[in-house]
């Protein structure tokens, strides 16, 4: 018992809970809510229950990244995902952003276009999804079949870039502190960047520079619209998802980081780790992001299934400035507090990740205090 106070004091000083200055934004800790698709925005309009969900996970000086949000009607690939392209959607986001800001947290919106990761059911007038290619995604083990995409014409690409620009502007109008461009996980930007998907012969295909041209032009447009200090990007050069991989991920990641550095003050680069290896029953971080971390001038956020111990280590080692948590934060709304106390974590229920219920698996994960109160009642 005499050692308990020392343990609490040590826990308060863990690397994940040290303050950090991201550009001009002051963070009180380094535990970031990763963007998580939750499929609960009925009719593509954010709902009041999202204000409960996000404010539960908000702490003073914490950073939350909202779920991937459609930039246009053609951007959708999953049911009930939110948009940011109509005035109704902008107005619906405002009270959600306000709820997070009342907690003193910072809130960024991830903006995306899924490209070919869609079906005609989600597309306007039942049209084919658009992509860099007309190659269809190979059905996965779940049996999900995505529709054959239509290859974007060269003269159509500026419109998609402008959709990203307007989405960023709309996000700022809704009150968000900034935006994260979704350039990861096999969605539209990666369908251009990665050579397994991009088979174009125009200026957006072929060489690495050409394949990255679309993503770079999106970045340029968004930065010009809202300022580099309000823009981050998520990249996953090593990830093979949705039939989207690259023959030289290090070259791809390095090239993209170099393009980010051309914008002075570009806020952050959020990268996803290669798969973690299992060695002697424990996960081992591949540390594959180190070259990009060294090259990038701004804040570097790492993601990829980290736990408390791994997150503390990468911050202490200078491998990352911030660590994004997805499933752990989904299931533990008070995750920074639990990390501080090294408290037990709620287990997540995968079966409720993408259901449309506004409470179950969404806002009903208990806080530590609720568990403690239940224990006291049980043993009283």
UniProtKB/Swiss-Prot annotation:
Family: Belongs to the NADH:flavin oxidoreductase/NADH oxidase family.
One Gene Ontology biological process: defense response
Keyword Lipoprotein: no
Protein name: 12-oxophytodienoate reductase 1
Gene: OPR1
Organism per entry: Oryza sativa subsp. japonica (Rice)
Pathway(s) the chain acts in: Lipid metabolism; oxylipin biosynthesis
Induction trigger: By wounding, jasmonate, salicylate, salt, drought and cold stresses, sucrose, copper, cadmium, mercury, UV-C, fungal elicitor and ozone.
Residues the entry annotates as binding FMN: 35-37, 68, 110, 234, 305, 326-327
Chain residues that bind substrate: 182-185, 275
Function recorded in the entry: Probably involved in the biosynthesis or metabolism of oxylipin signaling molecules. In vitro, reduces cis(-)-12-oxophytodienoic acid (cis(-)-OPDA) and to cis(-)-OPC-8:0.
Enzyme Commission number: 1.3.1.42
